[in-house]
């Protein structure tokens, strides 16, 4: 079968769908090698996947600050040189990039050697890397309804985000038992994506006594480097114990989302895809400094589809009231869950796998048989 390179590191939003795609390719007998960045979040997440082959590539994020810009240019140059050697040695049938600062090297190296390239953009506003690299792509996968003028004619395919096989709803009772939360109380899960969100962490610290007083348990995933693992016991108005838990990282996403009655989170595309798959209603607080304001666009679409509600970061003072209104409204929660089930009908992973195989057949490229190669960047 064929070899594929998948560029998908730097954030959980890139890495998770890359892993999902790599597993799908392996299941079909293809070879996969994952190229990842040097960031801590990549190292933490890949520890669960010893069967996949990960390779770190040089790269740092873009910045207009003179020192960081110089570093960006330097690491991009090293990354391009590294990827030229990688593509020459691997002889892939195709390269897939999920965006981010490590995509350029492998995409350009592939094009120089005539290897077909597919790009996947998960957000409803395409990022800089996807916009720039789309002119070199044979396929550009975009969320339904999103357009990209720079993409070659006929290259765009509507596509959702591939989700890892283990991301699926499980029994709420079993999920709560795993984390030690009571079944008879409401549970709010708070997290800011793979890198955490200080604003949400601070909100939990400030509001946890009031939430506990109403009988709402909280599990807050702070993000690496943004606190330490900690459990606090508070009381309801009636004196019953309420568990408040802080975790720096959680690699049990299906159990965590299944345990929750409601999630309070940022609005990255990866987070939203996992909420949809686990059918967990959410209050989304878009990160206002996200590139091209893509989180606000993601959140607005999620709200229009009926998966939850959106609160702007400038309105954090109103979030506690919003949480309490939603989390105790069983009819509204049922409505949200039904809408999330409807949103999850399309199997994006299978659709993408089929199209990638068609792309490589049409292009006529042939890779060496063996393992699937996923490049996590």
UniProtKB/Swiss-Prot annotation:
Keyword Mitochondrion in annotation: no
Keyword line: Cell cycle, Cell division, Cell inner membrane, Cell membrane, Cell shape, Cell wall biogenesis/degradation, Glycosyltransferase, Membrane, Peptidoglycan synthesis, Transferase
Subcellular location per the Swiss-Prot or TrEMBL entry: Cell inner membrane
GO molecular function: UDP-N-acetyl-D-glucosamine:N-acetylmuramoyl-L-alanyl-D-glutamyl-meso-2,6-diaminopimelyl-D-alanyl-D-alanine-diphosphoundecaprenol 4-beta-N-acetylglucosaminlytransferase activity; undecaprenyldiphospho-muramoylpentapeptide beta-N-acetylglucosaminyltransferase activity
Catalysed transformations (reactions): di-trans,octa-cis-undecaprenyl diphospho-N-acetyl-alpha-D-muramoyl-L-alanyl-D-glutamyl-meso-2,6-diaminopimeloyl-D-alanyl-D-alanine + UDP-N-acetyl-alpha-D-glucosamine = di-trans,octa-cis-undecaprenyl diphospho-[N-acetyl-alpha-D-glucosaminyl-(1->4)]-N-acetyl-alpha-D-muramoyl-L-alanyl-D-glutamyl-meso-2,6-diaminopimeloyl-D-alanyl-D-alanine + UDP + H(+)
Uppermost EC category: transferase
Record: residues binding UDP-N-acetyl-alpha-D-glucosamine: 11-13, 123, 164, 194, 295
Enzyme Commission number(s) of this protein: 2.4.1.227
InterPro entries (UniProt xref): GlcNAc_MurG, Glyco_trans_28_C, GlycoTrans_28_N
One BP annotation, GO: carbohydrate metabolic process
Pathways involved: Cell wall biogenesis; peptidoglycan biosynthesis
Principal place of residence: membrane
Membrane topology of the entry: Peripheral membrane protein
GO CC terms in record: plasma membrane
UniProt cross-references to Pfam families, sorted A to Z: Glyco_tran_28_C (PF04101), Glyco_transf_28 (PF03033)
Top-level lineage group: Bacteria
Family: Belongs to the glycosyltransferase 28 family. MurG subfamily.
Main function: Cell wall formation. Catalyzes the transfer of a GlcNAc subunit on undecaprenyl-pyrophosphoryl-MurNAc-pentapeptide (lipid intermediate I) to form undecaprenyl-pyrophosphoryl-MurNAc-(pentapeptide)GlcNAc (lipid intermediate II).
Protein name per its UniProtKB record: UDP-N-acetylglucosamine--N-acetylmuramyl-(pentapeptide) pyrophosphoryl-undecaprenol N-acetylglucosamine transferase
Gene name per UniProt: murG
């Amino acid at each position: 079968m064929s070899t594929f390179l998948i560029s998908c590191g730097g954030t959980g939003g890139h890495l998770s769908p890359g892993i999902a795609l790599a597993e799908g390719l392996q299941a079909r007998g293809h070879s996969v090698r994952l190229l990842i960045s040097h960031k801590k979040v990549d190292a933490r997440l890949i520890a669960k996947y010893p069967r996949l082959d990960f390779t770190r590539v040089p790269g740092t994020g873009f910045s207009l600050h003179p020192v960081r810009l110089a570093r960006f240019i330097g690491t991009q140059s090293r990354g391009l040189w590294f990827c030229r050697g990688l593509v020459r040695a691997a002889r892939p049938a195709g390269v897939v990039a999920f965006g981010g600062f490590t995509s350029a090297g492998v995409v350009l190296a592939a094009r120089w050697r005539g290897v077909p390239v597919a790009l996947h953009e998960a957000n409803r506003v395409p990022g800089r890397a996807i916009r720039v690299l789309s002119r070199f792509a044979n396929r550009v996968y975009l969320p339904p309804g999103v357009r990209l003028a720079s993409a070659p004619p006929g290259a765009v395919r509507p596509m959702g985000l591939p989700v890892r096989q283990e991301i699926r709803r499980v029994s709420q009772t079993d999920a709560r038992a795993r984390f030690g939360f009571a079944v008879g109380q409401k549970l709010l899960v708070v997290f800011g994506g793979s890198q955490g969100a200080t604003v949400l962490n601070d909100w939990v610290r400030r509001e946890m006594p009031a939430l506990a007083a109403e009988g709402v348990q909280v599990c807050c995933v702070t993000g690496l480097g943004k606190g330490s693992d900690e459990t606090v016991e508070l009381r309801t108005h009636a004196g019953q114990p309420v568990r408040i838990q802080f975790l720096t990282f959680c690699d049990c996403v299906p159990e965590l989302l299944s345990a929750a009655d409601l999630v309070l989170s940022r609005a990255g595309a990866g987070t939203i895809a996992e909420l949809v798959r686990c059918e967990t209603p959410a209050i989304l607080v878009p990160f206002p400094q996200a590139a091209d304001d893509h989180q606000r666009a993601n959140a607005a679409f999620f709200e229009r589809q009926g998966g939850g509600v959106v609160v702007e970061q400038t309105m954090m003072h109103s979030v506690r009231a919003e949480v309490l209104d939603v989390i105790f409204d069983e009819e509204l929660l049922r409505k949200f869950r039904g809408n999330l089930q409807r949103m999850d009908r399309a199997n994006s992973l299978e659709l993408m796998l089929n199209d990638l195989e068609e792309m490589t057949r049409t292009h006529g490229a042939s890779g060496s048989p063996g393992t699937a190669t996923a490049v996590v960047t």
